């Protein structure tokens, strides 16, 4: 599913919106965790890089994905709700070898209360962040798209309950791309990879890591803060502000870019 997301972002960055959204829909049909970075599509929609009609690809590709199982005899109602069923399987822990906020506050107590509070918290944070970004009239460059994927991938997984150690795989892939653009940020990728390897190591060796997950969660928080600062700097860099500061000027700039690319 990471390969599908990479293809999706590639086509979206090159203004081939339908192709990009078909790949995103295919990724969603494969893996629910595709939703971790869904807010970046909302930002592209606000900036008129994606239209509402393009989002039809998500349910269409999901239906295509469940069609073989339906034909084979599995109940359609069960197939439609399979992601909801999967989301309720890990109720025994708030964080499964994942360095996020629940490793700091304790991931084995008040499970139901923290799950509800955590979901409300991340929804509130995402709404505030997306509203703030929507009012910033900046150019949607390829670098910014990559940065958005990394940012939302880190943000959502840090606050959503029941995260597994493998759920940062997608973010790590895009973080590598981002650090190849911003070489001075390469230590962030090295650090993020270390955190991922710690979780994998415990799974493979069945032994607890030498460093507590609480300490690792603070390191992950530091990475999130640094990436957030990169987003803030981009939004407030005068070089990235649109001429006229309107969505219309963003559309004109996009048309110019498409014209130069021959799309």
Where do the language-model regions lie?
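Multi-pass, polyprenyl lipid-linked donor-dependent membrane glycosyltransferases
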Residues: 1-6, 30, 167-168
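Specific aromatic-rich, kink-prone transmembrane helix
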Residues: 1-17, 174-175
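Membrane-interface alpha helices of multi-pass inner-membrane proteins
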Residues: 7-11, 18-43, 151-159
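Perimembrane helix-loop-helix junctions
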Residues: 36-60, 71
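Aromatic-rich transmembrane-lumenal/periplasmic boundary elements in polytopic membrane proteins
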Residues: 54-100, 104
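Aromatic-anchored segments of alpha-helical transmembrane domains
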Residues: 62-68, 151-159, 191-205
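Aromatic/glycine/proline-enriched transmembrane-helix motif characteristic
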Residues: 84-158, 232-235, 245
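Aromatic-enriched
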Residues: 185-252, 263
């Amino acid at each position: 599913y990471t390969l599908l997301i990479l293809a999706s972002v590639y086509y979206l960055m090159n203004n081939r919106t339908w192709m990009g959204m078909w790949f995103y829909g295919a990724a969603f049909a494969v893996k629910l965790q595709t939703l971790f970075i869904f807010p970046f599509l909302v930002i592209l929609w606000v900036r008129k890089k994606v239209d509402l009609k393009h989002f039809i690809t998500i349910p269409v590709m999901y239906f295509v994905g469940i069609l073989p199982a339906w034909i084979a005899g599995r109940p359609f109602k069960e197939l439609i709700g399979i992601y909801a069923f999967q989301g309720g399987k890990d109720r025994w822990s708030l964080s499964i070898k994942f360095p996020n906020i629940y490793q700091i506050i304790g991931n084995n107590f008040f499970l139901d209360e923290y799950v509800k509070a955590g979901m409300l918290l991340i929804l509130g944070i995402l709404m505030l962040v997306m509203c703030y970004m929507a009012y910033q009239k900046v150019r949607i460059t390829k670098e910014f798209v990559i940065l958005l994927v990394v940012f939302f991938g880190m943000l959502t997984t840090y606050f959503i309950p029941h995260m597994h150690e493998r759920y940062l795989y997608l973010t790590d892939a895009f973080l590598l791309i981002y650090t190849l653009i911003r070489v001075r940020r390469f230590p962030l990728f090295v650090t993020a990879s270390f955190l991922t390897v710690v979780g994998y190591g415990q799974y493979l060796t069945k032994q607890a890591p030498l460093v507590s997950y609480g300490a690792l969660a603070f390191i992950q928080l530091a990475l999130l803060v640094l990436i957030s600062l990169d987003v803030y700097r981009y939004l407030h860099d005068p070089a990235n502000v649109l001429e006229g500061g309107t969505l219309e000027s963003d559309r004109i700039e996009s048309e110019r870019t498409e014209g130069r690319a021959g799309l």
